[in-house]
Amino acid sequence: MKTNDNYIEEVTAKVLTSGKYSTLYPPTVRRVTERLFDRYPPKQLEKEVRKKLHQAYGAYIGGIDGKRLEKKIEKIIHEIPNPTTDEATRTEWEKEICLKILNLHTSTNERTVAYDELYQKIFEVTGVPTSITDAGCALNPFSFPFFTEAGMLGQYIGFDLDKGMIEAIEHSLRTLNAPEGIVVKQGDILSDPSGESDLLLMFKLYTLLDRQEEASGLKILQEWKYKNAVISFPIKTISGRDVGMEENYTVKFENDLVGSDLRIMQKLKLGNEMYFIVSRL
């Protein structure tokens, strides 16, 4: 007779063998399967897991081809000659290259107008961190020329769900000779053990977490160990329309923090995104 764990493992394995879901982080698929297990009979469970994954991770599933992404990045790198002159010239080359790479993903594309001052403004409030954790990083590891220029020369760890994207980022960072302290890996902030760093980045992630599990964004902020965290929200739609997102997200986030041990140190608005710099009381 199959146990509950047997059913969960079986459904998780079936979902992960599907081409559409095969590059998704396995603990994420198992977590979703476990959450839905008591709600649906075994014969319906696999269908509901797929449905939930599509709802929660539609931006990743089917939207990322790691090999294609890697080729696009390689093309960008080879189109702009690598300078062999002074360090300042190389830094400007890295910034030009990385901005083009950051344009390849919707979330970082919207942020390219802000990178020149984003980390400097954050570090003015938090101090220069010795370590950064970037949860749900997407292509944000390629902002390294901007946070290193702002003084962050320690360890940066970025993680995201899609294996193909992470492998493409790893390979491309090596091609660019990025600092050794920059590490990317496959991971899920809701599935993995809590971590520790000076600065936790949750760019456009808080709302996505809450959509998966109620109040999980706040739960992560309370469980992780950090000196400061930066949580961002979009203030306009992808098409640039103002539909009240800034007010709605601000009210929601401020209300979430009521009664917690967290406080907002500063709110920044850069481009179509707002950033809340948070610390513990």
UniProtKB/Swiss-Prot annotation:
Binding-site list for S-adenosyl-L-methionine: 60, 105-107, 111, 136, 160, 186-187, 203, 212
Keyword NADP carried by entry: no
EC assignment: 2.1.1.179
InterPro entries, A to Z: rRNA_MeTrfase, rRNA_MeTrfase_GmN_bac, SAM-dependent_MTases_sf
Alphabetical list of Pfam families matching this protein: FmrO (PF07091)
Keyword Metal-binding carried by entry: no
Keyword set, alphabetical order: Antibiotic resistance, Methyltransferase, Plasmid, rRNA processing, S-adenosyl-L-methionine, Transferase
GO molecular function: rRNA methyltransferase activity
GO biological process: response to antibiotic
Enzyme class label: transferase
Catalytic reactions on record: guanosine(1405) in 16S rRNA + S-adenosyl-L-methionine = N(7)-methylguanosine(1405) in 16S rRNA + S-adenosyl-L-homocysteine
UniProt-listed NCBIfam families: 16S_rRNA_Rmt_C (NF000150), 16S_rRNA_Rmt_gen (NF000466)
Family in the record: Belongs to the methyltransferase superfamily. Aminoglycoside resistance family.
Role of this protein: Specifically methylates the N(7) position of guanine 1405 in 16S rRNA. Confers resistance to various aminoglycosides, including gentamicin and kanamycin.
Protein name: 16S rRNA (guanine(1405)-N(7))-methyltransferase
Phylogenetic classification of the source organism: Bacteria, Pseudomonadati, Pseudomonadota, Gammaproteobacteria, Enterobacterales
Gene name of this polypeptide: rmtC
